[in-house]
């Protein structure tokens, strides 16, 4: 009886990439901004506390600081302070994560469109795109450009809709539990390169130590089952 080979796998319809901590090493700059604000308020900035803010949009982080930590500022001023500090840190320079540009260029060579899906504000994303190369992305979705931010699925749903593809056919790339929750809730498959604990492998989730370990053409998880 002849052996029938399995059907050829299909590449993802799109690559939907988080920015901070995933493509560029800015997650620590964001957490440094949060830590500086906490210390100014006389509060502890332990690793456990800071992990709660990893991947969080500025407005969500500000609300959390005011409501859960009792900082002596209102939400609007807290958000402005965090945004100003984080933006200054990013403007001073960012480092691209190992393998990030190779992953994006490989996707482009394979005809897979890429979108940037970030909880950062538009002006921060634009700064980072100068380093990453805006030409590598078909579109970007930033904070406030979807009805709800991460961990809700809206940013990923918006990116998939903008590219005209089904989220279930997309591969999302994330580094935090907040972003991972958003991607999975949108129905995407997930490639996680964790910057903080909390993401575990699963039926739709692969976890790698570095994007340098990934080649879309050879990576089984990147293809729908």
Predicted region positions:
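Asp-based, Mg2+/Mn2+-dependent phosphohydrolase catalytic module
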Residues: 2-13, 105, 112, 121-225
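N-terminal helical cap/lid subdomain that shapes the substrate entry/recognition surface
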Residues: 2-110, 123
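Ser/Thr-centric signal marking residues that sit
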Residues: 22, 26, 118, 142
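Conserved SAM-binding loop
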Residues: 23, 96, 114-117, 172-173
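Residue-level signal for inorganic ion chemistry
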Residues: 62, 118, 183
């Amino acid at each position: 009886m002849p052996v029938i080979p399995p059907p050829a796998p299909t590449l993802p319809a799109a690559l939907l990439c988080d920015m901070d901590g995933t493509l560029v090493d800015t997650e620590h700059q964001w957490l440094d901004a949060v830590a500086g604000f906490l210390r100014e308020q006389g509060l502890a900035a332990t690793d456990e506390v800071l992990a709660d803010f990893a991947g969080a949009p500025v407005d969500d982080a500000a609300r959390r600081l005011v409501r859960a930590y009792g900082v002596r500022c209102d939400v609007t001023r807290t958000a402005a302070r965090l945004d100003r500090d984080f933006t200054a840190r990013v403007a001073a320079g960012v480092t691209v994560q190992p393998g990030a540009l190779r992953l994006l260029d490989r996707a482009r060579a394979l005809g897979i469109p890429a979108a940037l899906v970030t909880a950062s504000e538009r002006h921060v994303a634009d700064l980072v795109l100068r380093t990453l190369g805006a030409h590598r992305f078909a579109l970007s979705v930033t904070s406030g450009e979807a009805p709800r931010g991460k961990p809700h699925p809206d940013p990923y749903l918006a990116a998939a809709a903008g590219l005209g593809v089904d989220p279930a056919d997309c591969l999302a790339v994330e580094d935090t539990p907040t972003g991972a929750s958003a991607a999975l809730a949108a129905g995407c498959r997930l490639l996680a390169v964790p910057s903080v604990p909390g993401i575990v492998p699963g039926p739709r989730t692969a976890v790698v130590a570095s994007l340098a370990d990934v080649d879309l053409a050879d990576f089984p998880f990147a293809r729908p089952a």
